[in-house]
Curated annotation (Swiss-Prot):
Optimum pH is 6.0. Gene3D superfamilies: Vanadium-containing Chloroperoxidase, domain 2. It catalyses: RH + Br(-) + H2O2 = RBr + 2 H2O. InterPro entries: Br/Cl_peroxidase_C, P_Acid_Pase_2/haloperoxi_sf, V-haloperoxidase. This is Vanadium-dependent bromoperoxidase. Homododecamer. Catalyzes the halogenation of organic substrates in the presence of hydrogen peroxide. Signal peptide: none annotated. GO terms for molecular function: bromide peroxidase activity; metal ion binding. CDD domains: PAP2_haloperoxidase (cd03398). Binds 1 Ca(2+) ion per subunit. The binding is important for enzyme stability. The active site is at H480, H487.
């Protein structure tokens, strides 16, 4: 028996009205203006022949640069800005990309023997027009904003770049061994250097911008070194449980799980996650220890000129659970967008972590005669945790390309290195970083030793001094501006969905860490309490800071982008709530420590 036509029309009208209501809700949120920090205009110099470089703190990667790392022609950058703001494919295709080409071979003419010997091609800017795209759910990409990025001469920027150099110098340190005697010299050096900087040793002042106040970090200790500041990130082991543990497998009720656990593991399923009837491992490929990139000025300049070194990193045989700073940097090099959060969701579901008690149909089936799946169940959260990712990416792409256009840390390291070498000759090429060079003197000396060792290993028996920021990736940063971070905005959005669905206050009964010697999990000596929300927040910080550890993002990129992603996810949850017939709310603990109901 069919459904009467009148009922179908009524349903169609109700469906239309629901969509209109969602659109009206999105419109009612309003638009938050996006403001840059003013440096693009401050360092604009249309006449480079007078000796002042142009756009030195803007993202110019891909355009031709001079021997100091400044763009040769400011008009190239202005054309770049016009093209990305228009989104016109032809305008983008007509931009100057990379160096001059050899008239005979047609290949780019690189500065370094390495790039020329590999016959490298150029790489293009990544999705520069994505922020111009419209979406059909959640906040419009251009309706939410990030605050202005820290300026080049600020105490915050000096602290950020100091932290990145220190992370780079400690890439072989194990997360579980920060307090080990064997690492004491490096760890104490890092702590002392950071605590000696104004950003860490001076409290926020009345009248400071709110965004700066919320990013402000106090005294650095062994317990919070290189950690995030989201609620839970400073509690327990450095690594979130959800990036190292596994889950119960199918057949676990009859002992089927045991076949997947290594004989020497402390258990928690040995880092193996049930993905349906197959398993996926939390283990990561082992990047060659001590192998850093872009430590030579000519190679660095080639990368700024668009040399495509992707794929030229090297690895040890096998894989292991994340153990070192370099391991985490490797994890975030090739992760599949929402991988960490889908994995976390699979772990939470397989281990029967309860949903938020406010979500419908949480009683025993014998009481409400229903189980959850399409709505408020496994299928719902598995779909939604991935669905928010590209919406968040569009929002951050708009901030990256169309608003802030912040230079990557590798380029800041270039300014510092060039100026440090000039200072030793009594000169100053980029006086804007004179203070940074002075305050980072001890860190830069260690960086020079590390870079010299790397450059000798790369075949230069007598390398020139280099104070560049060592990169974990052969290609350096991705081909888009630094502020904000794609990894961080996705982290913020996906973790927000997970916290909305699962019982955030649920306590984790056993805490694990990765063994310092063997590829296995061991029970942690931590005696405090970890919660689902805290470990999900820590997961977001781990992934976002992993990009900092690789040398491709700053702390402010990571922190502000997580908050941006949260806004996207909240908007989607609000709009989708209009589609449900059940009367309920999501209870969401936000990244600022407050709790809201959706």
């Amino acid at each position: 028996m069919g459904i009467p036509a009148d009922n179908l029309q009524s349903r169609a009208k109700a469906s239309f009205d629901t969509r209109v209501s969602a659109a009206e809700l999105a419109l009612a949120r309003g638009v938050v203006p996006s403001l840059a920090n003013g440096e693009e205009l401050l360092y604009r110099n249309p006449d480079p022949e007078n000796g002042d470089p142009s756009f030195i703190v803007s993202f110019t990667k891909g355009l031709p640069h001079d021997d100091n790392g400044a763009i040769i022609d400011p008009d190239d950058f202005l054309a770049f800005v016009r093209a990305i703001n228009s989104g016109d494919e032809k305008e983008i295709a007509d931009l100057t990309l990379g160096p001059a080409r050899d008239p005979d071979t047609g290949l780019p003419i690189w500065r370094s023997d390495l790039a020329n010997s590999l016959e490298l091609e150029v790489r293009g800017w990544e999705n520069s027009s994505a922020g111009l795209t419209f979406d059909l759910e959640g906040p419009d990409a251009q309706s939410i904003a990030m605050p202005p990025a820290p300026v080049l001469t600020s105490p915050e920027l000096i602290a950020e770049i100091a932290e990145l150099y220190l992370m780079a110098l400690g890439r072989e340190i194990e997360f579980s061994e920060f307090d080990s005697p064997k690492n004491a010299e490096y760890i104490q050096f890092a702590i002392d250097q950071l605590n000696g900087l104004e950003w860490f040793n001076t409290p926020a002042m009345l009248g400071d911008p709110p965004a700066e106040i919320r990013r402000r970090r106090g005294e650095v200790t062994v317990g919070n070194l290189f950690r995030g500041i989201l609620p839970g990130s400073e509690v327990g082991p450095y690594l979130s449980q959800y990036i190292i543990v596994g889950s119960k497998q199918i057949g676990s009720a009859t002992g089927g799980n045991k076949t997947l656990v290594s004989p020497n593991a402390a258990d928690e399923f040995d880092g193996e996650i049930a993905y349906g009837s197959i398993t996926i491992s939390q283990r990561v490929r082992i990047a060659t220890p001590g192998r850093d990139f872009m430590t030579d000025l000519k190679v660095f300049l080639d990368v700024q000129d668009a040399a495509d070194f992707r794929g030229f990193e090297s690895y040890e045989p096998g894989a292991r659970l994340i153990r070192t700073i370099r391991d985490l940097a490797t994890w975030v090099h090739f992760d599949a967008l929402y991988e960490a959060y889908l994995n976390a969701c699979l772990i939470l579901l397989a281990n029967r972590v309860p949903f938020d008690p406010n979500i419908p149909f949480q009683q025993e089936d014998k009481l409400d005669n229903q189980d959850v799946f399409v709505n408020f169940g496994d299928a719902h959260v598995l779909s939604l945790v991935t669905e928010v990712a590209t919406r968040a990416l569009k929002a951050v792409r708009y901030q990256k390309f169309n608003i802030h256009r912040r230079l990557r840390p590798e380029a800041t390291g270039g300014l510092i290195s060039v100026n440090k070498i000039a200072a030793e000759k009594g000169e100053s090429v980029f006086p804007e970083v004179d203070l940074a060079v002075e305050e980072l003197e001890d860190i830069l000396e260690k960086a020079e030793i590390s870079n010299r060792k790397q450059n000798i290993a790369d075949g230069d028996p007598d390398p020139d001094p280099s104070f560049l920021l060592p990169q974990a990736f052969a290609e350096g940063s991705p081909f888009h501006p630094s502020y904000g971070s794609g990894h961080a905005v996705v982290a913020g959005a996906c973790v927000t969905i997970l916290k909305a669905f699962f019982d955030s206050n649920f306590q984790i009964d056993q805490v694990f860490e990765v063994d310092k010697d063997e590829d296995k999990l061991v029970k942690s000596s931590f005696k405090g309490t970890l919660t689902v929300a805290g470990e999900l927040n820590k997961l977001a910080d781990n992934i976002a800071i992993g990009r900092n550890m690789a040398g491709v993002h700053y702390f402010s990129d990571q922190f502000e982008s997580i908050l941006l992603g949260e806004q996207v996810a909240i908007g989607i949850l609000e709009e989708q709530s209009l589609t449900y017939g059940e009367n309920f709310f999501f209870n969401l603990p936000k990244f600022d420590g407050t709790t809201i109901q959706i």
